[in-house]
UniProtKB/Swiss-Prot annotation:
Pfam family of the protein (one): Ribosomal_L17
Coiled-coil region list: none
Subunit: Part of the 50S ribosomal subunit. Contacts protein L32.
UniProt xrefs under NCBIfam families: L17
Gene that encodes it: rplQ
InterPro entries per the UniProt record, alphabetical: Ribosomal_bL17 (IPR000456), Ribosomal_bL17_CS (IPR047859), Ribosomal_bL17_sf (IPR036373)
Name of the molecule in the record: Large ribosomal subunit protein bL17
Entry-linked HAMAP family: Ribosomal_bL17
Organism encoding this protein: Clostridium acetobutylicum (strain ATCC 824 / DSM 792 / JCM 1419 / IAM 19013 / LMG 5710 / NBRC 13948 / NRRL B-527 / VKM B-1787 / 2291 / W)
GO biological process: translation
GO molecular function: structural constituent of ribosome
Disulfide bonds: none
GO terms under cellular component: cytosolic large ribosomal subunit
Length: 114
């Protein structure tokens, strides 16, 4: 039984770069529109970043900085997003299905912070 993560049809370096960009955009804007599988992978990583930010120490900040590509987003994550979820253990995100994409019929969803 395969488990772990989705390959998303890309080599490792491209997949990692794409997911870093998706997580950064998601944390910056609070919601993004993407495909189901990308959203599920992004959700997993974003929730890990929020949990790290809730710790609030320097090591956690550096760990988040090594993944999130913009310092302003890290500042927002630690100062605004993490305190909002201080009482909640996980489940910081929600996925809404929007139907198929017009061009290729891929299932589109909106991933947003709860």
């Amino acid at each position: 039984m395969a488990s772990g993560y989705r390959k998303l049809g890309r080599p490792t370096d491209q997949r990692r770069a794409m997911l870093r960009n998706l997580v950064t955009s998601f944390l910056k804007h609070g919601k993004i529109e993407t495909t189901v599988t990308r959203a599920k992978e992004t959700r997993s990583l974003a929730e890990k970043m929020i949990t790290l930010a809730k710790r609030g120490d320097l090591h956690a900040r550096r760990q988040v900085l090594s993944f999130v590509t913009e310092e302003t987003v890290v500042k927002k994550l630690f100062d605004e997003v993490a305190p909002k979820y201080s009482e909640r253990n996980g489940g910081y995100t929600r996925i809404y299905k929007m139907g198929p994409r017009r061009g290729d019929g891929a299932e589109i969803v909106i991933l947003e912070l709860v």
